C-alpha cells in the first residue's frame, strides 16, 4: 500500500460520534506511550498528524485519519498506565472495548507492543480479547531501534510464543522507519 494522502478526519469521545462505516478501518491499539501516534506519523510521512507526547495518556479520544480518501487509520486511547484519574481511565476502557466489539468496519487491529517490554499482561489480554472476537490482528513491536540485535531476537521469540494467532509481527522503528515497507505491504490484504 502506498500512502499518497493522509489527513485528520475527526475525534470522538463516544460511539455515537463515529463516522459512517463506509471505509475499512485499521486500528492502532496498545498501552499508553507505546508509540501509536508516532507510528501513525511515521507511516503517513506527515509529522504532527497525530499528536505525540512523552506523557502517557495523551490520546484521550478515538482519532480518525483518512488515508488516500478511502481508508481510516484509527488511533485509540492507550490502555494500562496513564496520568489520568480512575474515572477517565474507566471511560477509555469501556470506549475501547465497545468500539472493538461493535465496529463492523474494522479490517485489521494493530496491537503495538514496546519491544523493550514484550508480552506484558495487558497486551496478552488485548490479544486474547481480539481472538475471542475473531478480529484479525497484527503485532507491531515498536521502539525497535532501542534494542541490540540480540535483545531484538529475544523479544521477538518471546512475542511469538504469546501470539500464535497474529497475522504478522513487524519490528518497527518510528525513528528510522525500519519496518515501514513491510507493514504497508501487510495492509494490502485488509483494505481491498
Swiss-Prot record:
Quote the record's binding site residues for Mg(2+). Answer: 37, 59
Keywords, in A-Z order: Cell cycle, Cell division, GTP-binding, Magnesium, Metal-binding, Nucleotide-binding, Septation
Q: Name one GO biological process term.
A: division septum assembly
The intrachain disulfides are: none
Q: Which cofactor does it need?
A: Mg(2+)
User: Which Pfam family, just one, is annotated for this protein?
Assistant: MMR_HSR1
| Any one Gene Ontology molecular-function term assigned to this protein's record | metal ion binding
Q: Where does GTP bind?
A: 30-37, 57-61, 75-78, 142-145, 172-174
Q: Any one cellular component term from GO for this entry? A: cytosol
Homology family: Belongs to the TRAFAC class TrmE-Era-EngA-EngB-Septin-like GTPase superfamily. EngB GTPase family.
Q: Which NCBIfam families match?
A: GTPase_YsxC
Give the protein's function.
Necessary for normal cell division and for the maintenance of normal septation.
Q: What is this protein called?
A: Probable GTP-binding protein EngB
**Annotated organism of origin:** Chlorobium limicola (strain DSM 245 / NBRC 103803 / 6330)
Classification from the root reads: Bacteria, Pseudomonadati, Chlorobiota, Chlorobiia, Chlorobiales
Q: Which gene is the coding source of this polypeptide chain?
A: engB
Amino acid at each position: 500500500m502506498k500512502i499518497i494522502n493522509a489527513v485528520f478526519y475527526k475525534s470522538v469521545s463516544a460511539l455515537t460520534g463515529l463516522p459512517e462505516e463506509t471505509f475499512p478501518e485499521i486500528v492502532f491499539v496498545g498501552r499508553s506511550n507505546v508509540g501509536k501516534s508516532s507510528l501513525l506519523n511515521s507511516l503517513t510521512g506527515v509529522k504532527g498528524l497525530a499528536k505525540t507526547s512523552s506523557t502517557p495518556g495523551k490520546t484521550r479520544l478515538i482519532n480518525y485519519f483518512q488515508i488516500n480518501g478511502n481508508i481510516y487509520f484509527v488511533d485509540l486511547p492507550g490502555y494500562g498506565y496513564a496520568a489520568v484519574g480512575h474515572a477517565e481511565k474507566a471511560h477509555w476502557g469501556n470506549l475501547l472495548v465497545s468500539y472493538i466489539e461493535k465496529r463492523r468496519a474494522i479490517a485489521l487491529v494493530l496491537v503495538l507492543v514496546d519491544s523493550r517490554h514484550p508480552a506484558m499482561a495487558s497486551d496478552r489480554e488485548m490479544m486474547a480479547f481480539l481472538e475471542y472476537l475473531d478480529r484479525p490482528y497484527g503485532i507491531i513491536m515498536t521502539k525497535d531501534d532501542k534494542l541490540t540485535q540480540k535483545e531484538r531476537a529475544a523479544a521477538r521469540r518471546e512475542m511469538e510464543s504469546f501470539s500464535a494467532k497474529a497475522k504478522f509481527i513487524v519490528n518497527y522503528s518510528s525513528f528510522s522507519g525500519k519496518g515501514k515497507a513491510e507493514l504497508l505491504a501487510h495492509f494490502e490484504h485488509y483494505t481491498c
